[in-house]
Amino acid sequence: MRPYQQEAKDSIFSAWEECDNVLFQMPTGTGKTRLFSSIISDIKAWSTLHSFDCRILIIAHRIELIDQISENLQRYRIPHGIIAGGRERDLRQYVQVASIQTITHHANVDAISELDIRFIIIDEAHHSVANSYRKLWKMFEGAKILGVTATPWRMNGSGFYPLYDRLITSKPIKEFISEGWLSPYNFYSVKSQSLEVQTISNINEFDIEGDYKVSALEKEMDTMQIRARLLDSYLRLAKGKKGIIYSISRKHSEHIREEYKQAGFKVVTIDANTPRDERRLYVQRFKNGLIDIIVNVDIFSEGFDCPDIEFIQLARPTRSLVKYLQQVGRGLRPTEGKTTCIILDNVGSCLKFGLPNEERSWEEFFMGKPEKEQTDHKNYEASFGLGTKEIDYTEGSDELCLVDGVENPPSNPENKTPAWNDADDDLLRVLFVEKGCSINLLASVFKTKEVVIKDILKRKGLFTEC
């Protein structure tokens, strides 16, 4: 466990002593799955010690998230069952990972309610104010509930209280970056007078959640001129780097893919209709460097775990702070050799929501903040010096400008491990306990200081100084 994860866990257990329903905010890329895996292990250890049958339910709303949670639980050797669609169920396991749609379906409610669930963990908990989630509180009355999200925010301004009794927030993104836990970035955006922003401002068709209608976005934003400007900004600012482009729809993805493919790049598209095995193959090939760019439709907004992303390009306008921060957050996972992530905001989202590292009033959003009172950042060009570094487009008079960035990434702080990821915990244990590797050798393997290795081993109960 990283120090901030241990602090978070302690805060959550302390809050549970005073109330039942806790919402925890933690930025994308900072290891929430590792956190709640550790929470599950502690609950299981306590229940075993006290001979108490304590069942735990983990809830997600998409099959991709369920699969990812299951894979992580396997990595941490936590036996579990899955309750999702037509998948085979093993209700004997004390941990169950469930789809919210399946577990609240009327055909399953009676059987599931008999499981005597004592703890519930809700992933991507910004969705949990929906009616389908509220059924959980009725089905498992008296259970301790933990909601985990990077963004406790609702587009309509409705809050999370009193559904949740308390909000616990982690440190802001700016601190995670300065301490080396998240990657620095260079953020480029179009100006408020750009063609893209002016086009978006004229769209007045919205879906049931309040975001732009896909059909309206396709009509206005999927044009040859705007797509050419996407490619142009990539060529000028991120050429040769691998990353993710967020698109509007399948059709928009295909159009973008063709533009980049003709420019000589290895590009694939992924959406909800892409078969799971094919999707995993693409992601693996991306990690191995066989694919340069993945163009996707919302699939990688939630739950995509790949630290190798060197650039993010926003080609899909949104009115959702949740989507915006999740999308840019995918590029902030640190990895060896990665100095910065390049973020290309070709739709001007930062003008509405601010930069990723801005400190936000999560407590206000938790209690409820009307949409009309939510901050709009139209003055970023003045307040952040937009235009100090300008790049002219080959066509038109608009510019993509550096809004925020770092000249020199922060050095590795004392006793920190910036590129450490959750899989390293298992590898460290195997090398130290099973293979008998020395502290000196482990420090060399993990490219860090001996004191860092000792500190991690001490926290895991594997090492004591004589």
Locations of regions flagged by a protein language model:
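Conserved interdomain linker/interface between the two RecA-like ATPase lobes of SF2 helicase motors
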Residues: 167-244
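Post-DEXD/H (motif II) to motif III coupling segment of the RecA-like Helicase ATP-binding lobe
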Residues: 127-187
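Conserved helicase ATPase core of P-loop NTP-dependent helicases/translocases
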Residues: 88-90, 255, 265-297
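Conserved segment of the helicase C-terminal RecA-like domain
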Residues: 331-358
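A short beta-strand element within the Helicase C-terminal
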Residues: 293-296, 302-317, 323, 340-345
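Conserved helix/coil segment N-terminal to the catalytic DExD/H
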Residues: 86-116, 130, 134-135
